[in-house]
Every structure is written in structure tokens, then in C-alpha cells.
Amino acid sequence: MQVSGILSALFLVLLAVIVSPFQFVQPKRILPIPTSRDQLLRGQLAYLKGTTVAQPAVNDNTLGIFEASAMAKRLRGEPIRFGKRSPREPIRFGKRFNPLPDYDFQ
């Protein structure tokens, strides 16, 4: 009688140890597939900022033409020039944008 009680208690402890890590796993959100160019860029911006929601609640933060082209250049690793470049300043290739580290959203 005591052996079966000890074995059932050990079985319950083993089951709790196996199951406990999985109760904290959050299901991945399925975001809609971006259809337009500015939705795609907004999703990339959300990835670089480290936010989880790519679509803003109020659409007052849309990217303009300059911001979208600068963002696309930055993602491709191309240099972004503002105005005319002085001849003494060389174009530095290979300067790629380092994205933010993956945050642990708890």
C-alpha cells in the first residue's frame, strides 16, 4: 500500500516536472501577410524596434517616401547620403544596420 502511494507520488512529481515548462510557452501570434510595400516596411520597422505588433492602432505614423527609401537602403546595407557628399568623405560600404537583440516578452 505504501509502495503504490510512493510510486504514484513520484509519478505525479515526474509528470509535473515534464509538463511545467510547457505551461509558460506563449503561442506565436499569426500576423497577416503584408500586401503593400508600406505594410512590409512597417513590419520590418517593428522587427528592428523589437515590438511585437507590426500594425499600429492609429495610422498617424505612416512612412513617407523619404523614410521608406531610407529604410529600404538601410536594410540593404547601402549608404544613405544627405545632400552632396564632400570629396574628402569616402563612401563606407559594409556598414550594415545591427538589429536590436531579441527581447523576451514576458
Curated annotation (Swiss-Prot):
Q: What happens when the gene is disrupted?
A: Knockouts generated by CRISPR-Cas9-mediated gene editing strongly inhibited the peripheral induction of the mitochondrial unfolded protein response.
List all Basic and acidic residues biased stretches: 82-92
Keyword Ligase set for record: no
Where is the chain membrane-spanning?
Answer: none
Extract the ranges annotated as region (Disordered).
82-106
Q: Does the keyword Signal apply?
A: yes
Q: Where does the signal sequence lie?
A: 1-27
Describe its function: FMRFamide-like neuropeptides. Involved in mediating arousal from the sleep-like state called lethargus, which occurs during molting between larval and adult stages, in part by regulating touch sensitivity, and working in concert with neuropeptide pdf-1. Involved in neural modulation of systemic mitochondrial unfolded protein response.
The name on file for this protein is: FMRFamide-like neuropeptides 2
Tell me the organism: Caenorhabditis elegans
Gene behind this protein: flp-2
